[in-house]
């Protein structure tokens, strides 16, 4: 056998070994990728280029959160307005992260008492700190109809509406109770409190009253 033929055979054996090694390696890699790209149920996992899985997950989270909100807050929201008010609460949270619906209700009841007592004492300074200056004159017209504050335990409050107009937040609360004040036996009024979402000041002001 000539040296050339022997040399060709050697190259052929080397080439066969290299090709076989490549096929084995590539085959193994492909198989591993198939295993990686299968779920526990064995179906292939498709890359989610639209991020719909993430969106769906967030949607589920939002729905769960909303359901929890409705369960937690239903006792402090007027029954017919639950969905609209929960929407409003979510809207406020986007602007005021520290907003606490339950705490706000309790503080509003305290503000109600402070306003009525200040009105009865004709404390203009305190009223000016609690009432929007654009509404103060209108409020002064109805002061005589309240008399003095009588019983805080009889006063209840529920959210009836929440909305934004520009950067201003408006929260309307339904105050109810019997003999809460001297001159109104059966109190049923909607008080609107407002504040600017962009200001650093955290004060809310009474901006309107409707008797229902």
From Swiss-Prot:
Domain of life according to the entry: Bacteria
UniProt-recorded name of the protein: Uncharacterized protein RP434
Originating species: Rickettsia prowazekii (strain Madrid E)
Organism taxonomic ancestry: Bacteria, Pseudomonadati, Pseudomonadota, Alphaproteobacteria, Rickettsiales
